[in-house]
Curated annotation (Swiss-Prot):
Gene name tied to this protein: pth
Site (described: Discriminates between blocked and unblocked aminoacyl-tRNA): 9
GO cellular component, one term: cytoplasm
Database matches in Pfam families: Pept_tRNA_hydro (PF01195)
Disulphide bridges: none
The protein's name: Peptidyl-tRNA hydrolase
Amino acid sequence: MKLVAGLGNPEARYENTRHNIGFEVVDELARLHQSSFSSGKGNFLYSKIIHRNEPILLLKPMTYMNLSGNAVIAAMTFYKIEYQDILVVCDDLNIALGTIRMRAKGSAGGQNGLKHIIQCLKRDDFARLRVGIAPDHPVSSYSSFVLGKFNAEERKITDRMVSLSAEAALDFVAHGVEHAMNHYNTGKKTQQ
């Protein structure tokens, strides 16, 4: 079984914010497979889907972003999933809006949810899909920016980026992280 964990914050006030793009990606995967989310044996929501005969656990931590590792560890323990079989999907302030980047390992890059997962796993060699949300203009507060919603023009790009991210996640499941990196790390932005 593979685990695809989309990071975000619970509560309706955070819905459709830049920081919750990970939730949007796992929501899209569930929608594509006509599945819905249920409460898990831990502080998370989950959905089980199958892609190319591979079972996938979709996960939305309900711990708030900065404690995402608690939910990921709980799901991995309960479902007996190894670190090599997880993909974490999160926002990235350093990548342009419309661009996604798959990585096999690495630092948190300033993303606190990813940082907490690395701390809880005590390793950084697990796959992650970074979804670009970088502003195209100066911002006075990055905290306010990531907790803000996309404007109408950004939303058009974001919708395509969420679809592309869902495709990349399924490619990871079917073919592995190296294959997904080769096919989705093109540096091209989703067209406006």
